[in-house]
A protein has these predicted regions:
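Glycine-rich phosphate/pyrophosphate-handling loop used in enzymes and phosphotransfer proteins
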Residues: 1-202
Length: 202
């Protein structure tokens, strides 16, 4: 099956050649140079978080920004895998696995929650673009720790106008979301630890 899938992928690339999502270098989903822009370990204090900080794979600029836009708003689903891998590497470097051991005694499940998009954005994209990344991270953490880790589509957006990429800086993005993001009816987060995953840190 893998050989057949590889053959089809090779044929598709011959018929419809692609370029790197970040710089358009031929025959790469993300070339090594652009992929390196997601191999950072950025963090800032976040007092309400269990670890006391948020973490990011890279700065939203240059090739990283271009590739995120190609993936998020122009349907480049082949970026799911390299972005997922970058997220898993970040989780390991940032100490998420060690932090999970710290909450083992106080919660029975860790939920990986993808940040929600507006209904209009999801209709335009035809999918929940963060879900493949959340599933990959959940499987990675479950394999590494043996802990019960699940993906939970816990959040919903209502009444948000415009796109996050059209705002400038975290303050504008935070104002755009304020009062519009809520937990879905019927979802309980009691006795659960939550890892929130987003494409752009807000």
């Amino acid at each position: 099956m893998n050989l057949m899938a590889g053959s089809f992928a090779h044929m598709a690339n011959l018929l419809f050649p692609r370029g790197c999502a970040g710089c358009d270098k031929p025959d790469d989903v993300l070339c090594d140079a652009c992929l390196a822009s997601f191999d950072c370990e950025l963090s800032q204090p976040l007092e309400t978080a269990e670890m006391g900080r948020w973490f990011a794979c890279g700065w939203y600029r240059g090739a990283a920004r271009q590739s995120i836009l190609a993936w998020k708003d122009h349907g480049d689903e082949e970026c799911d895998r390299p972005f997922s891998d970058a997220l898993c590497r970040l989780a390991e470097r940032a100490g998420v696995i060690d932090a999970m051991d710290g909450v083992r005694e106080i919660c029975d499940t860790i939920l990986v929650v993808p940040a929600s998009s507006s209904i209009a954005s999801m209709r335009q994209r035809g999918r929940r673009h963060m879900m493949p990344l959340a599933k990959r991270l959940s499987a990675f953490l479950r394999c590494r720790t043996g802990f019960r880790v699940q993906v939970c589509d816990a959040l919903t957006n209502k009444g948000i106008k415009g796109k996050s990429v059209e705002t400038k800086g975290t303050e504008q993005r935070a104002q755009r979301l304020k009062g519009h993001v809520m937990v879905r009816p019927g979802v309980t987060l009691q006795n659960k630890a939550v890892i929130l995953v987003d494409d752009i840190v807000t």
